[in-house]
Amino acid sequence: MTIILTDPVCPVCEFPSNVELHFGGLVCGACAAFFRRTVSLNIRYLCEKKNQCKGKRKNCRACRFDYCVKIAGMKRNLVRQRKNSTNTPMYILNRRKDSGNEEVVRGFVTSTQSKWAQHSRKSSMSPNKEAEKDVSKILKISHGRLLKYYIYQITQGKWVNMNTLNIKSVEEFLEITSIHNKLAAEICKTCPGVDLLDNEDILTIRKYFQFSNVWIESAWNYLMSADKHVQIDDSELDLTLLKFINQVKSTLLVSLSQLKFNTIEFAAFKSICIWKLVYHGTSRAMKIIAQEHYEGVAKALNDYYQTYTSMKKSRYLQF
């Protein structure tokens, strides 16, 4: 008789994993890291269903932490407090400046976002509300400046010579992607609203920036370059990689050539691709930030069409 060994199921997230003893409870490494971070940062999550969420508890951080304590038996007093502020989210540092090391309450809408919502309601009664309507209260930036942020990313020029569609070897591809990944990490630090996200969410959005830089922007630069018809020697390329590059050329590249974007339109397109948030799980806070980026860029693009072009509404709807 054949015995099939399977990984045990974590009692918190209910996923098969390597379960070990962490902080007094038998859980997976991911739930242990979540528990450590929550306790060390003194965070209390709220659940809009009063800790009665069904299904996988990873989707609700309040229920996940509740299961860490009540089901797995993890103990808060076994977690060491952080000795420095390295990798501490900005919203935690700002809260500590205002109220010391008091408990930080977070939920489906963060406390910071609640303050902004209250400020937004007060601003609606202000005589300057027309001047303020083009400013995102959450991102703390105007729609026009938000679009300019993405325009700057594609016009600063230091990525033009790092095009993955022109690579000649796997080594060159790895070198280019490594540089793009570092640039994506730098961009994330200055992206409006990212300072409001947890480290897990920041790592997720960084993946979208990386993919956008490596493939979407490469396709754009390839389309705009004068040497796109030069034959590349692909004899040294890995067959799978070559197949994927050809697929990018036959799909994304063809679509971009048909849309005929100018620089401003492509910047808006790239931002929408980054914040589409389809392929990785995201938190409620991250979805709020994504919606702010989408609405801000869309409004700025609409203003651009109405002010500087004759394309008006038809082009905006096509976009």
UniProtKB/Swiss-Prot annotation:
Q: Which GO terms describe its molecular function?
A: DNA-binding transcription factor activity; sequence-specific DNA binding; zinc ion binding
Keywords in UniProt for this one?
Answer: DNA-binding, Metal-binding, Nucleus, Receptor, Transcription, Transcription regulation, Zinc, Zinc-finger
The UniProt entry, under SMART domains, shows:
HOLI, ZnF_C4
Give the boundaries of each NR C4-type zinc finger. 10-31, 47-63
Major subcellular location class? nucleus
Q: Which SUPFAM superfamilies match?
A: Glucocorticoid receptor-like (DNA-binding domain), Nuclear receptor ligand-binding domain
The cellular component terms of Gene Ontology attached to this UniProt record, alphabetical and capped at eight, are: nucleus
Kindly give the InterPro entries that the UniProt entry links to this protein. Answer: NHR-like_dom_sf, Nucl_hrmn_rcpt_lig-bd, Znf_hrmn_rcpt, Znf_NHR/GATA
Task: Indicate the residues that the entry says bind DNA.
Answer: 7-81
NR LBD domain residues are 130-319
Where is it localised? Nucleus
Protein family: Belongs to the nuclear hormone receptor family.
- Tell me, what does this protein do in biology? Orphan nuclear receptor.
Annotated protein name in UniProt: Nuclear hormone receptor family member nhr-174
Q: Supply the source organism for this entry.
A: Caenorhabditis elegans
Please spell out the taxonomic lineage of the organism that makes this protein: Eukaryota, Metazoa, Ecdysozoa, Nematoda, Chromadorea
